[in-house]
Amino acid sequence: MTKIVLKPGEPVEVAMRRFRRAILQTGLIVELKSRTAYEKPTTERKRKKKAAEARLRKRLRMQMLPKKLY
């Protein structure tokens, strides 16, 4: 459970912003969105494979030198 303690004199808006940031860091919102509807195992595998390929492409893109240097 994520808890935020209000500091003395802290506006509620700032505390809400801190709470939202803390919730995003835990990954709770993403998990809740993924659990709202049933996802077939084949669809889940396809989604995970597509995400893994995107991560690989991103990693390769980061390792390449800029065009100006070679």
UniProtKB/Swiss-Prot annotation:
Record GO biological process: translation
UniProt keywords, alphabetically: Ribonucleoprotein, Ribosomal protein
Single GO MF annotation: structural constituent of ribosome
GO cellular component entries: ribonucleoprotein complex; ribosome
Alphabetized HAMAP family for the sequence: Ribosomal_bS21
Family per record: Belongs to the bacterial ribosomal protein bS21 family.
NCBIfam families, per the entry: S21p
Protein name as it appears in the record: Small ribosomal subunit protein bS21A
Lineage: Bacteria, Pseudomonadati, Pseudomonadota, Betaproteobacteria, Burkholderiales
